[in-house]
Amino acid sequence: MNATTPLSVPSSDLERNRFFMVEQQIRTWEVLDPVILDLLMRVHREDFVPSAHRALAFADMELPLGHGEVMLSPKTEARMLQSLMIKNTDSVLEIGTGSGFITALLASLARQVCSVDIVPEFTRSAAAHLSAAGIKNVTLETGDAARGWDKHGPYDVIVLTGSVPVLPESFQHSLNPGGRLIAVVGEAPVMQAQLVTRTSGGACSAVTLFETCIPSLKNALQPQRFKF
């Protein structure tokens, strides 16, 4: 299947809704990598959505998880994932486990994933969901990783699922040469998804992928503010 070949419409309501999520939301938002599109058909998003919002599992919106956090919209998840070009030899760090759905997607592509969340409830529920999905190449940690997490590093890929007003340099230092990092940087209402790449010489370059606005990581590094 190439990037422009549409999938056939499934017969069941559940699979039909998943199909339309991929074809109408995700593919139309410049996500054309067939590996990513196929992955989003195979990994069951509804199994990671809080039961109160399960009917909205395929909706083009963020879903509340509690504790001020959200499950990102499907197209945002897909666009971030596509930009990282994850290989099956990559080690991945995820900051903000949340529902565990992005964790599952990352683990389906990479060799190993370390996912950290400051909320113990999220770590516990994600562990149950990942186990039910048969995903075993994930290490879940509970802790404050908003300003860095060196344990198990360095990494080939780092994903921040919450925004940061300023991207701490510690994350860049935790990247292997050739490593990629994606984060939403800025403060509401102006935030941008940025892809950071570390060169073989150790320098980092960043490109802006798209504009969005998502909740901040708890205890995120704040910019210096002038006082008058």
Predicted ranges, named:
Residues 2-93, 101-104, 109, 122-124, ...:
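Class I SAM-dependent transferase core
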